[in-house]
Amino acid sequence: MRFFPFLTICALFVSCTFSPQDCKEVIRSMRGKTTVIPFDKMVCWLNDSIIHDTITQRAKYKLVVYVDSAACSTCYLNEMYQWHDFVALEEDSCFSLCFIFAPPLANRHSLQNHFFRTELNHPIYVDTSYCFLNENPHIPSSIIYHTFLLDGSNKIALVGNPLHNKKIEKLLRDHLDRER
């Protein structure tokens, strides 16, 4: 909770920096762009293991949640429980959450220790070489664009965080319902 004021200030800063028209333009430019998820260049952690293949890689639709080096990775780990309702959607194997963390090299060990202590039962991908952003230059640096849905062709179909925006949550659920 001690990071809540910081996150609130960041959200206010972002909301004051971008006009709704600017956001619409950025989202419009992202939609339909093919996004590469270089699974083979990232490490996948699950509980106390390192694994090499997950349902995430095989799912038709992937909700990518990208946490870059500018964000507080351990803060995101502490908030992972909020994704519980969306993890339940993974039972239908056409959908999966894809958490990608790109921590600064100096923080990687502490992130690993923290992750294994949280006993989360969901894989996360750790991008230590920043290959995800390198292979996807169309993804803006602002955190508000770091959660998006990829369709079956790995094209961006929806941009936004369903935890923070009920309209995005409804659009995501409607999209998945249509595809079942």
Label each PLM-derived region with a short phrase.
Residues 112-144:
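Short, internal strand/loop/helix patches
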Residues 144, 149-180:
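Thiol-/selenol-based redox modules, centered on thioredoxin-like
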Residues 48-49, 53-54, 69, 93, ...:
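Coil residues (strongly favoring Ser/Thr
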Residues 1-16:
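Sec-dependent bacterial lipoprotein signal peptides
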Residues 53-77, 83:
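Short active-site neighborhood of thiol/selenol oxidoreductases, capturing the structured segment around
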Residues 69-74, 104-106, 163-164:
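Short acidic, S/G/P-rich loop/turn micro-motifs used as interaction or catalytic elements
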Residues 76-117, 132-135:
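Structural microenvironment flanking redox-active thiols in thiol-disulfide oxidoreductases
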Residues 17-56, 77:
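N-terminal "domain-start" segment that seeds a small globular fold
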